[in-house]
Design a protein with these regions (language model features):
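Glycine/charged-rich beta-loop-alpha catalytic/anionic-binding loops adjacent to active sites
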Residues: 56-66, 116-122, 202-208
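A short helix-loop
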Residues: 1-2, 26-37, 57-58, 103-188
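Amphipathic, well-packed alpha-helical segments that form the structural scaffold of globular domains
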Residues: 53-57, 141, 145, 200, ...
Length: 254
């Protein structure tokens, strides 16, 4: 289209604090980063962003003048697809990171979490995220369980299935082994890109299965921490939709 456009949800959530709540650029917060006129124009997700240009038509085969809607980001779209279209509906997205979106009637004031007007008209949301989830399990696969990966590559079972073996024989708490999952900084509630992962309580009795279970537990504790903060605001959570590759894990770590 030749137009630089972002939907309100993504603009206010991912580019905070560069925009005011009405979608106009904030000159003060833009100052150290860019000029306000360099920011994308904020529109609603179902607005028309523009129309297919001649150049785009030649590259894509789409007819010149075809309207193109603004759309939204992957997590917002997936939340709607799962059913987050009313207050009390919540999505937990299990991918490289974990992202949670809870529909609410009103905006919640809590600096620990993200909150904005949602894509669905008249609906607000609280959102939160854990930076290392699937990326943490992948790190364990590649670094701590390379034999499981090699077995898979030679026609054996999926490496993650091999890694889950015997985890259910380890008690909750991984025999005192605790992980902080901040291997890639952390989003909410600490919002600190410099946070780092920690594994403490190691003894000679611990195995790599203990380490992996502790990592899975740490992600579960992180999700629980976010949920507890949300519930501090007396917002209902009536239904939770779980999506993403993390749903394929067949052993619960807690």
């Amino acid at each position: 289209t030749g137009n630089y456009v972002v939907d309100r949800f993504l603009g206010l959530a991912s580019f905070n604090p560069l925009y005011f709540n009405d979608g106009t650029p904030n000159p003060e917060t833009c100052l150290p980063i860019c000029r306000p006129d360099q920011l994308a124009e904020v529109k609603e997700a179902n607005d028309i962003a523009g129309y297919v240009t001649e150049t785009a038509s030649k590259e894509t085969g789409l007819a010149v003048g075809t309207p193109v809607i603004v759309g939204t980001d992957d997590s917002g779209a997936e939340a709607i697809s799962t059913g987050v279209v009313a207050p009390g509906k919540m999505m937990i997205q299990f991918g490289s990171s974990i992202y949670m979106i809870l529909g609410t009637k009103e905006l919640v004031d809590d600096e620990r979490l993200w909150r904005e007007e949602f894509i669905v008209p008249g609906l607000c949301d609280i959102s939160a995220g854990t930076n290392a989830a699937g990326s943490l399990t992948k790190w364990y696969r590649n670094t701590i369980f390379p034999d499981a990966l090699e077995l898979e590559q030679n026609g054996g079972p999926d490496a993650y299935i091999t890694m889950m073996q015997d985890l259910d024989k380890i008690p909750v708490g991984s025999d005192g082994l605790i992980t902080l999952p901040y291997f890639a900084g952390e989003r909410t509630p600490i919002n600190d890109p410099l946070a780092r992962g920690i594994l403490f309580g190691l003894t000679l009795a611990h195995t790599r299965q203990h380490m992996y279970r502790s990592a899975l537990e740490s992600v579960a504790y992180s999700v629980n921490q976010q949920l507890k903060i949300m519930l501090e605001h007396d917002v209902p959570i009536d239904q939770i939709f779980a999506v993403g590759g993390g749903c394929l894990l067949y052993t619960s770590p807690s």
